[in-house]
Amino acid sequence: MLAGLITETDIQKRAMFADASKDEHGHLRCGAAVGVGPDYLDRAKALVSAGADALFIDAATGHTTRVMDVVSNLRKLTDRPIVAGNVVTAEGASDLIKAGVQAIKVGVGPGSICTTRVISGVGMPQFTAIQEVASVARPAGVTVIADGGIRYSGDIVKALAAGADLVMLGGLLAGTEESPGKVVHYQGRHFKQYRGCLLYTSPS
């Protein structure tokens, strides 16, 4: 009876990617995002069936009745971790925690590609926002994710010092050779197209 099979490729991958995040079956972990539109529940069911390890709820502003309802309904659907946001206040974080999230994304408008502050007139400096959210998330054992505003390596340190458990990097990595995306040649320079979570097309 065959109990398992290990190939040379498996050994090479383990050596090359020793820090890869894998589940108990050795599969790479994968999170998937759903919006808050009418079909979010069907999409979430399909993603969970496909093996998504976590569900991210994408919304420009996370402290809304709609987002709270979506979190509550997804919590009934699955025990997979739910990540929601974005919020910038302790009150917003507290409401998301009550709704059933395991992690909260912090930041309204600090990202290099984000226009939420300009369009809606709502936002808060990222350091202050992280402190606000962490003040209620940390005691509750909920992960704090700093989303946006990371332009220099020092910004990562500042986010962690403010209370974030981890940071999301978009624009900082989007222009690297390793990142996916169409290369655009303009005035003798190379650029890459990249998109924000809630945008269909965005310039680089």
How would you label these PLM feature ranges?
Residues L2-T9, K13-V144, S153-L166, G171-A174, ...:
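Alpha/beta enzyme core
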Residues C30, V183, G188-K192:
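Alpha-helical transmembrane segments of multi-pass membrane transport proteins
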Residues R195-G196:
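Active-site pocket-lining/capping segments in soluble small-molecule metabolic enzymes
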Residues Y200-S204:
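Conserved small/polar residues in nucleotide/adenosyl-binding loops
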